[in-house]
Regions:
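Juxtadomain low-complexity/linker regions and immediately adjacent membrane-anchoring helices
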Residues: 55-91, 170-175, 181, 795-832, ...
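Extracellular/lumenal mature domains of secreted and surface-exposed proteins
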Residues: 692, 704-801
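Short carbohydrate-recognition loop motifs
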Residues: 486-516
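Chitinase-like catalytic core of GlcNAc-active glycosidases
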Residues: 116-328, 898
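Extra-cytoplasmic beta-strand recognition segments
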Residues: 158, 504, 516-548, 573-577, ...
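Conserved aromatic anchor
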Residues: 637-649
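Aromatic, loop-rich ligand-recognition surfaces of beta-strand-rich domains
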Residues: 523, 535-537, 610-612, 831-894, ...
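Beta-strand-rich modules
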Residues: 677-704
Length: 941
């Protein structure tokens, strides 16, 4: 999604009154992905707050590298969950949400901004917040791409959608998502996903889920409760779609046990939510009702009238042409009321995963005669706005149209749209607000960026995402009243920020002395007698007068004049709040005025602060330690787990590398007392890196920091290796050799005995062999510390029999595998010559597939087409695999091994061998923790 490229540079910046510049050493490039470990030396010291010089952190040049021991958000199969123990979970400190659920203003106090909004309808968003079930860092990484959702004001409950038969079925939300949601007053649910058989579902998993102990307890339910309470989220979404097989059918007994499971869960944890998906009926059939009916009513209320689940998400087909005349939502509301169920505990499902706001919905089936809705609304995959976008700006644009409306103004009238056109969620849902108590501080941060700004100065070019430090965004996106001759529009901006990576920007033209007003926030804030109210802004094009316009609870509107105009540099404007002490603020707007005509105005908002004077304390960090460190095999990149103590909770903990010149380079910002540094580049030859953690409060004041030193492994000597594109060839054939020497290699020397060029230098060399024979090849890696040789004896076979090139031997070969998902993904599809079909095996790795070539042949290469070659995500490409050959099918010899692949297609040439059987062992099936092997084709030559 990144749409700009910045060159590597290191510029020292001081955030004192004057900026001073200096040069620092830039890091090295390169590095492999095979993890290696070494001892670390930890030296902790306390550093007092002082003026710091900041070296501009360079861009991450190795985004594809992920260290093996990166902390990971959790996921389990049911039986695995039973073995989970928080006390021994090394990732626990990274996976716990630390942001409490914010209290929102009461519904009856909310103000509607258009004629179709109502206060009763709830909304549930089932969203893909991370692209896969596994491999998700708890608090982001040094990448900008992330679903940094920003329309929380329209959501009451977020379901963190995940689960797959190849990774895990029980998926708690990652803590960064919970933190962002809680900050906005949104409840978050994890997912319990029982997939259909076609998607790898197994009845044994459902049986594991529903196991009941002799004492009447349900062990998996107890674990679900423990996970939610330990990690700090509000409950679970139950998605049971495993329909069974003829041999293992789904029955009414499963349905009854599911109801009992849910009741037990609610008895043990009444404060946690459990939402049931309209799928399995009470008679044990997979029969989506698309409504509340007698077939699924028992999942909400038992025959005895006892409550079961808290709510139900209704399937999507109530709006289809075939079911429209049944008015299923109207009937659902009626049946709910008859049984003492709040109709707004039913969520009418709308599937927008494929088409987003282009999805046609018969909204009249959702709307009732009183101007409200029959049920609440459930959106499946509003994450479409992110996954279908090619730039971050397009993501914001699509998100705005999806959640607000096509006019980008929640106060706009959408009645003129046709019945099936997308009206925007703001047409039904009144905006919620968590602004109910001081302090209120926003830096307009979306939780990601292409760089990081501190007090308005750019201190890092490192891409980043961490939704845990996202801010509360404007409630109204956007309501602007332009004065005569003015034309301003609003959006988010990644080019500049006050703190974080984004700001709010207004662009357009203004007439002299003519005001425009932008309404930003709904609130229910009582002004304290010592309240500080400031706004950081900057204007390009002219100076701007920026007055605050506050609507009060009694309906009056107060305009507070700023103490200074806004110029081209970040300006912190203060407002005197003495006239509103003790009064309740209902909305926050700004009046913008220019003293001259201006076109091309750019007005950025970087921070709004409302807090009681002296209410923010400064934290002190201590006990900073390196919990764990690992290094790539070249010792050029590190993955580092840091943890520390803090005497009081800080809003932010800034993590820096301390450079040799004592300047600081920002590595990231955390809201917890731990942080993971991924792919930290080695920047010098001292074999040490010092880190500093600086606590920062909501007023952006620094507390006392702490430092620690980590040791790097000695990687002074290079490592030598190489590969050839062909190892079996005819005389005179050009063969290309590629160096696989380590990144610290300065010179690569080659020896080709018997070739037309017998010695050479360079990363890549092409030679030919004029005579038939078997030849060895040697490479020497050289740097200032010394040299290392690697020789492969008998590596090249030259024969006239290869004059017509390599022959494909494997198409249609016999196959045997240790596992496969179903008959549509059986092992024979790996040799059918079609890259749109695959062999897929689930369960714990490694996975094996063996090809029978029918007779003994000379084999010298195997091409493998991984997930990406078949159209799947590159994250699903096989990372580690081994190729073995055999003449008898019993005794196998390893001929090739890969530990760090990221490519969708791999060519693996090795010393020619006589073999009938070729075995592929998939050791690490994906780039993350997904254990499903996906091989679209294997070609043996």
């Amino acid at each position: 999604m990144k749409n700009k490229v910045l060159g590597r540079r290191c510029i020292a910046i001081s955030l004192a009154a004057a900026l001073s510049a200096g040069l620092t050493a830039c890091g090295s490039t390169g590095g492999d992905t095979q993890a290696a470990t070494t001892e670390t030396t930890q030296i902790t010291e306390t550093a007092q707050t002082a003026e710091r010089i900041y070296s501009l952190t360079e861009e991450n040049e190795n985004q594809e590298l992920t260290m093996a021991r990166q902390p990971e958000s959790s996921y389990w199969f049911p039986s695995e969950l039973l073995s989970w123990d928080a006390k021994t979970d090394e990732d626990l400190r990274f996976n716990v949400s630390t942001v409490p659920l914010s209290e929102r203003a009461a519904r009856e106090h909310l103000q509607t901004v258009n004629s179709t909004q109502n206060k009763e309808t709830n909304i549930m968003a089932i969203s893909i917040m991370n692209s896969s079930t596994s491999g998700n860092p708890p608090h982001g990484l040094n990448k900008v791409n992330a679903n940094t959702f920003t329309y929380w004001q329209y959501v009451d409950t977020l379901v963190y959608w995940g689960g797959s038969s190849g990774e895990g079925l029980i998926v708690p939300p990652s803590p960064d998502v919970v933190d962002a949601a809680h900050k906005n007053g949104v409840r978050v649910l994890g997912t319990v996903f029982m997939p259909q058989t076609a998607h790898g579902g197994k009845m044994e998993w459902l049986e594991d889920l529903l196991v009941k102990n002799e004492d009447g307890s349900y062990p998996v339910a107890d674990k679900l409760i423990e996970v939610a309470q330990t990690y700090g989220f509000e409950g679970w979404f139950m998605n049971q779609e495993t329909e069974g097989t003829d041999e293992e059918p789904l029955t009414a007994d499963h349905a009854a046990r599911m109801q009992q499971f849910i009741q037990y869960f609610k008895e043990q944890a009444p404060d946690l939510d459990l939402v049931y998906y309209d799928s399995m009926t009470v008679d044990g059939k997979m029969d989506w009702q698309n409504a509340l009916t007698e077939e699924n009513l028992a999942y909400l209320v038992s025959e005895d009238g006892d409550p079961v689940a808290d709510a139900m998400f209704l399937n999507f087909w109530w709006t289809s042409d075939t079911l429209a005349d049944q008015e299923l939502l109207k009937k659902s509301a009626a049946l709910a009321s008859e049984n003492g169920i709040n109709p707004y505990d039913l969520y009418a499902g709308v599937d927008i995963q494929s088409e987003g706001y282009n999805t046609e919905i018969k909204w009249d089936l959702f709307e009732n005669e009183e101007g409200g809705t029959y049920t609440s609304l459930g959106l499946y995959c509003p994450s479409w706005a992110y996954t279908s976008a090619d730039t971050i700006q397009n993501f914001w644009k699509q998100e705005n149209k999806l959640w607000v409306n096509s006019m980008g103004d929640p106060s706009a009238d959408v009645k003129k749209l046709s019945n099936t056109q997308w009206k925007g969620i703001s047409s039904y849902i009144v905006e919620r607000t968590p602004l109910t108590s001081l302090p209120f501080v926003t830096n307009f941060s979306t939780g990601n960026g292409y760089s990081f700004f501190k007090n308005g100065s750019q201190i890092s070019l490192l891409d980043w995402n961490n939704r845990s430090i996202a801010d509360i965004m404007p409630t109204y996106r956007y309501i602007i009243e332009n004065g005569n001759g003015n034309k301003l529009s609003a959006d988010l901006d990644v080019a500049d920020a006050y703190y974080g990576g984004t700001s709010l920007i207004l662009r357009g033209n203004m007439a002299k002395d003519t005001s425009s007003t932008i309404k930003l926030y709904a609130a229910e804030l009582t002004a304290a007698d010592n309240m500080i109210y400031t706004t950081a802004a900057k204007a390009k094009g002219t100076e701007i007068t920026l007055n605050a316009v506050l609507e009060l609870e009694d309906g009056s509107v107060v305009t507070l004049e700023g103490d200074q105009n806004v110029g081209e540099e970040w300006t912190v404007v203060s407002y005197d709040t003495s006239s509103i002490i003790g009064k309740t603020i209902k909305s926050i707007s700004y009046e913008i005025t220019s003293a001259e005509d201006v076109s091309g105005l750019q007005l950025r908002f970087g921070n709004i602060t409302m807090m009681e004077a002296d209410s923010e304390e400064n934290a002190a960090v201590s006990n900073l330690e390196v919990l764990d460190s690992e290094f790539d095999e070249d010792g050029m990149y590190a993955g580092v787990r840091l943890a520390w103590s803090s005497d009081i909770a800080a809003d932010y903990y800034e993590v820096y590398r301390v450079n040799q010149d004592n300047s600081r380079s920002l590595l990231g910002v955390s809201n917890t007392t731990s942080f993971y540094i991924n792919t930290l580049p080695r920047t010098d030859d001292t074999n040490k890196s010092a880190f500093e953690v600086v606590p920062v409060n909501a007023a952006l004041e620094e507390g006392n920091s702490a430092q620690v030193v980590m040791d790097w492994p000695d990687n002074s000597l290079p490592k030598a290796d190489f590969a050839a594109d062909v190892t079996l060839a005819a005389p005179g054939t050009k063969i290309t050799f590629e160096s696989l020497c380590s990144a610290n290699t300065e010179t690569v020397n080659w020896t080709f005995a018997g070739a037309d060029i017998e010695t050479a230098e360079g990363e890549s060399v092409s030679v030919s062999y004029p005579e038939e024979g078997i030849y060895s090849v040697k490479v020497t890696a050289v740097n200032k510390a010394g040299s290392i040789e690697k020789e492969k004896e008998g590596y090249i076979v030259i024969t006239s029999d290869a004059a017509d090139g390599l022959v494909l031997l494997s198409q249609g070969a016999g196959t045997e595998a240790d596992a496969y998902v179903n008959e549509n993904e059986a092992p024979e599809f790996a040799v059918d010559g079609d890259v749109s079909t695959k062999w897929c095996a689930t369960g714990a790795a490694p996975h094996e597939i063996t090809l029978d070539l029918g007779e003994v042949n000379t084999v010298s290469a195997v091409d493998i087409f991984h997930a990406e070659a078949g159209g799947e995500s590159a994250d699903m490409n096989t990372k580690s695999y081994t190729i073995l050959v055999s003449q008898d099918g019993n005794s196998f010899e390893e001929v090739y091994s890969v530990t760090k692949n990221t490519n969708g297609t791999t060519h693996n040439a090795f010393t020619p061998k006589d073999a009938r059987y070729v075995k592929l062992v998939v050791n690490k099936p994906t780039q993350g923790s997904d254990s499903a092997a996906r091989i679209y084709e294997i070609e043996v030559y």
